C-alpha cells in the first residue's frame, strides 16, 4: 500500500495510490463509507490508529469509490508526514568518510570516524520541518556555496517500544519513505 500526503484544492489530504497516476482521497472515502470512528485527516493521526486504520484503507480501496479519486496532475505532493521527531542515523561508512573528507577540505581540521561509530548506532536530531514533497523545488540558501544532496530512506515507527528484540523490530515499523 502506497500512502502519501498531497495538497488538493488548497487542502492537505492523505491519499493512497490506486493505480499509476490515480489516488484515493482517504478521508473523503471514509466519510462517504460512514467511517466516523477513524481520523484520516493527516498521516500522523493515521499512523497512531495502527493496523486497524490500514485495514480500513484496504477496505476503502476495494470499494473503489471513483468520486473519491484524484488524478496526480491535480495535486502538489507534500512530505508524507511531518514527523514528531526526526533522528538521522549515519550508517554508511563510505558516506561518512566522504563527508569527513569534505569537512577536512573546507576547514583544514582533520576529521576521522570515531571508534564508537563502529560499536553503536550514531544519530543526530534534524529539523523535523525540513522535509519536502515529491518533485518539490529545493531552496538553495543564499549563504551556502554548495548543496549536499542525499537520498535518504526513512523507517517510520508505528508503535511504541523499548528494548525490542531484533527479530521483533519489523513489527514496530509502520512503513518506509524515500
Where are these regions (language model features)?
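Low-complexity, small/basic-enriched stretches
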Residues: 1-37
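Active-site microenvironments in enzyme catalytic cores
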Residues: 4-6, 11, 38-178
Amino acid at each position: 500500500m502506497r500512502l502519501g500526503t498531497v495538497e488538493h484544492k488548497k487542502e492537505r489530504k492523505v491519499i493512497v495510490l490506486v493505480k499509476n497516476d490515480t489516488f484515493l482521497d482517504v478521508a473523503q472515502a471514509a466519510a462517504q463509507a460512514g467511517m466516523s470512528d477513524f481520523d484520516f485527516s493527516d498521516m500522523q493521526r493515521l499512523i497512531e490508529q495502527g493496523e486497524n486504520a490500514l485495514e480500513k484503507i484496504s477496505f476503502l480501496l476495494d470499494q473503489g469509490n471513483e468520486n473519491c479519486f484524484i488524478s496526480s496532475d491535480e495535486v502538489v505532493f507534500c512530505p508524507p508526514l511531518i514527523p514528531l521527531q526526526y533522528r538521522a542515523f549515519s550508517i554508511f561508512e563510505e558516506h561518512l568518510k566522504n563527508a569527513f573528507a569534505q569537512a577536512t577540505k573546507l576547514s583544514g581540521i582533520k576529521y576521522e570516524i570515531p571508534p564508537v561509530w563502529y560499536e553503536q548506532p550514531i544519530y543526530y536530531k534534524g529539523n523535523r520541518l525540513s522535509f519536502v514533497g515529491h518533485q518539490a523545488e529545493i531552496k538553495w540558501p543564499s549563504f551556502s556555496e554548495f548543496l549536499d544532496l542525499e537520498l535518504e530512506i526513512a523507517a517510520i515507527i508505528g508503535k511504541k517500544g523499548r528494548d525490542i528484540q531484533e527479530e521483533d523490530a519489523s513489527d514496530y515499523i509502520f512503513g518506509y519513505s524515500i
